[in-house]
């Protein structure tokens, strides 16, 4: 979910995994679909869903996570940003991230639907430097 230019998706496909990679600006190719989570559907559940720096962009987070629960039979693997934890919070940073989900919102919605199996804070690159405690990795399995 949120495959960007598709490096990870291509790597997984080359390693022999069946991959469906979605992004509104996904590249051309058999494994890629230009769509959003909101518009995506598949009749078969996925063994895992990987989302890297994309969950905070989902417009209706609750509905999006409910859809992931329906689409998933294995773990949800996230590499995300807690943009609202940046100190100092510059006006430019706030404006750039306005309308995106912050960490508290994402975490509350995840906890309502998934059981955490792994979590860690990670540095996140901002303006050429690594900002500690701004990125996070999360693995969860559906509570249903």
Predicted regions and their residues:
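Conserved S-adenosyl-L-methionine
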Residues: 2
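Class I SAM-dependent methyltransferase SAM/SAH-binding core
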Residues: 5-39
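A conserved beta-strand element that flanks and buttresses the S-adenosyl-L-methionine
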Residues: 50
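Short catalytic micro-motifs in class I SAM-dependent methyltransferases
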Residues: 53-54
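A short, conserved alpha-helix within the catalytic core of class I
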Residues: 58-68
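Conserved class I S-adenosyl-L-methionine
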Residues: 77-94
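Short alpha-helix
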Residues: 99-118
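Core SAM-dependent methyltransferase catalytic element
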Residues: 127-144
